[in-house]
Each structure stands twice: as structure tokens, then as C-alpha cells.
Amino acid sequence: TKDEVKIGNAAKRAMVTNPKNTISFVKRLMGADFNDENVKKMQKLATYDIVNKSGKPYVKIDDKEYSPEQISSMIVGKMKKVAEDYVGEEIKDAVITVPAWFGDAARTATKTAGELAGLNVLRVINEPTSAALAANLMEDKKDKTVVVVDSGTGTVDVSVLELSDGMAEVLASNGDVYLGGKDYDDAIVKWVVDEFKKSDDVDLTKDNMAYARVVESAEKAKIELSSSTQTEINLPYISMKDGAPLNLAMTLSRAKFESLVKNLNDRTVEKAKVAVEKAGKKYADIDCI
């Protein structure tokens, strides 16, 4: 907004009510040239304006233009503050993780974003390596071959790692920069909207505030279904019809959810298969995923 920078859940809520000034998936623009095919695709999908400035993609908000590094630095700066509040002291140094498929330009742009946020970036490392460290897969220093599947908000990255003597080598990577958690959310949103249209003859996509509530509830439902076999989606006073308020109450089972996202799961599995093949490995060679 004109008064403050909203990051995280506050920004997600603004995605529906203020889409023109809400920036998402800026990671896809990091280190890119304006004429890159990926930038052209982003221009079609983004709710905000992506403009050409000296051959580089910039994000336009009102009458100002920001580089992807500047936008990313705002997010990094927010996380720096969160970390400082947690440990109770200033944080100066950082190691930043990036997808294994990031090229040199994207890695340099990421380092720049960290520096703009006031950090001394010690290293930029691959996310799969970081995942292996976090999962304690390298502690025993035994040789093993690991597949890391990293499903983010808007991308899925699959990497095959060779772990040996406490070191990690990326043998192969594969991924899709247009497949991630948001696609799973969108599948639930579409189901809710379609079901409500059938039962109450009201299109919730026509009401920005109602649609924003559905989007928020879809993500919560997805998270709950990770540990439960079913979840309730209850949104009282979601809309009005003939002067009377309408309530939305639906039950979504895990089985139904899995059927809604089967094509997404199939795409992820296919990415993993290709990564294993690129690494020159067979399924029997994989020690863990």
C-alpha cells in the first residue's frame, strides 16, 4: 500500500482486493532478461505490471518501478526481523538457499537481494542440499543417493543428491516453475466455487471479499488434510441472495482432495522420474526420498 509494505498473510489477503499492487512469484524473475520466455509467460499470468527497464524485467507499482532484487529484499528483510526478534540480537550474516536449477544470474540476484536487506551473504547454496542437512541425512557420513522433492508455493523442484562423507553433490535436477502449492489451493477453490454455484446459484468469483475468504479457507483445508482424513469448510454469511444471507458449509475428504489434484501429483511424479533418469540412476539405487 502507499503507507506500508505488507508481506505474508497480509499480502495474500490483498491479492484479491488489490491485485494490481500485490506482487507474487517474483522469484521467477530473478536474474532474468526481459525477453526471456519465462518473463513473457509471467506477464500473461501476473496480476501486476512487468515492464522493460534497460533490458531487465521490473515490477511497476503505481508510478514506481522495482527490480526483482528490490522486491525480494523486502521479503528477506522481513525474515531478518523475524529471526532477530526470535534470537534477541542483530543478525548480520546469512546463508541463502535457492533452487538447484537457478543459474549464475539468478544466484547473483539473490545475493544482491540479501545485501539490500542489510545482510552479509556468506553463501548461496542449493535448496536440496539444505533439505538434506535439515533432515539430518548427512550426519552419519554414509554414502547414499537421495531424491529431494521441494514443492513450494509456485514451483516444484526435484533433485537427486549423492551424499558422501558429509558432502552433497547434486547429480541432476528437474522441476516446473508453474506447479506448486497454490495449484493445490486453486483446485479446492474451484471445487468450492462450483459446488456453491450448484447448490445456491451464486458465483462467488463475482464478489472479491467472498472469493478472498474461499481462497484463505482452501489453504487451511489443504493443510488440515495432511493430518486428517476430512475437514470442514465453514464460511458464514458468505453471500446474499434475495436479501437473505447465505452460509457455506462443506465437507472435503482427503480422498476427494486427492482426486481433485491427481493431475498435479502425476506431474510431480513425472518430474521425479525424469530427474532420476538424468542422474543415471535406477529406482533401486535410491536410498530415500
Name every feature range the model reports, one short phrase each.
Residues T1-K44, D49-S54, K60-M74, K81-I289:
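Oxyanion-binding/catalytic loops of NTP- or PPi-dependent enzymes
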